[in-house]
Amino acid sequence: MEEFQGYLELDRSRQHYLLYPLLFREYIYALAHDHGLNRSILFESAGYDNKSSSIIVKRLITRMYQQNPLIFSAKDSIQNQFFGHNKNLYSQILSEGFAVIVEIPFSLRFLFLLERKEIAKSYHLRSIHSIFSFLEDKFTHLDYVSDVLIPYHIHLEILVQTLRYWVKDASSLHLLRLFLHDYWNSFITPKKHITFFFKGNPRLFLFLYNSHICEYEYIFLFLRNQSSHLRSTSSGIFFERIHFYVKIEHFVKVFFDNNFQCILWFLKDPFMHYVRYQGKFFMASKDTPLLMNKWKCYLVNLWQYHFSVWFQPGRIDINRLCKYSLDFLGYRSSVRLNSSVVRSQMLENLFLINNAMKKFETIVPIIPLIGSLYKSNFCNTFGHPISKPTRTHSSDSDIIDRFLRICRNLSHYHSGSSKKKSLYRVKYILRLSCVKTLARKHKRTVRTFVKRLGSEFLEEFLTEEEVFLSLIFPRTYSTSRRLYRGQIWYLDITSINDLVNYE
């Protein structure tokens, strides 16, 4: 047990103190302003040289501490200057600067782990498509899978206690507690104020969510590495089981010099894989459902007793991988059995051999993607293309370039699809929506406008894959077409398109 406690104990040399004085440094707010997550209309005309001085920050913190966040009413929350709609720019800047400061201990710890383990910085592993190439290699050998939504409705004080392991500055923790209580009281405000609050503080709450996930996965990794020591306590009532363990321990003492942990390592599940994505995760295993049920019990107890989150065990389903599909990152992935019949003849005897091979398939779910196109006003609810009136004021080249960019980005992201039929339909919707937008701008019919543009306009919607393969195989069109129909994974995709992120 002392060894396990040492494993979970944090390296005290990596714990950093006195983060609170950084709130009064102007360069912190300049750093928060330059970060990509904090691009906002509020900051376009803000001069950080004279609007984030230490005097203003001190006044803001004093004003926040003078208010009692526990007795806000609905009316007070709406009129609160700290969370009001564009009423106090300085409070917005303060929250963004605070988010940068509390990230410092985590960033330094991450760099320390990279240096200690000498992990090579491979930019290809950052690609979203690298996950699917990994699944292609592993999932065809697995049998069971569980798709679980990570519970995140935890108590505010648990978030603060989690950060206490990393941030030892009491003043910073008190200020964080004040932010969280004000955030909690904002739930009683109208929806538009909540939406503005989330958009105005993306970095702070993204950090809080990631810290919660980091704590959960840190313990989960500990359970995974030490799973051979977690025997069932209920088995103690069976004397045969106790006698079995005693015999094994005696056998180990005699032949393996007390190296019991190495022997128990073989009782682990070496084929258990864990993948997290967009607030969810799935586990897949090769062995019987017994091991999956064991991990199900561990996770439920972890969330209930460590994070005080009530989680029903029935929400974790264990499914056979060959009969289940995973919807994540814009793809619907599954493992299918492809059977083939081989005819063999030996002398006068004829044999028919059935071969069943597992294949990892990824398709594009058309219904959610059409829903995203509908929300962006590219089509109606039935998938029929419509024009975009908001684009009629732009030039023809800008309209065409915008539609081409969206079409090529979607084709580039969904290049790993096993079946291209859904992708062809999406390209058809975007292409016809572009034509209708241009026809509406020039006040002409679609047929007349298509005749004016000619076939060259339709060729503009060729994807990068088609153009690339046509250059390699200029005379073998059937070969290039067959290659394009196959799966192509790119290692330069690090983010999800807004139209793909429909979950």
Swiss-Prot record:
InterPro entries per the UniProt record, alphabetical: Domain_X (IPR024937), Maturase_MatK (IPR002866), Maturase_MatK_N (IPR024942)
Localization of this protein: Plastid, Chloroplast
Domain of life: Eukaryota
GO molecular function annotations of the record: RNA binding
Sorted UniProt keywords: Chloroplast, mRNA processing, Plastid, RNA-binding, tRNA processing
Role of this protein: Usually encoded in the trnK tRNA gene intron. Probably assists in splicing its own and other chloroplast group II introns.
UniProt name for this protein: Maturase K
Species the sequence originates in: Kunzea pulchella (Red kunzea)
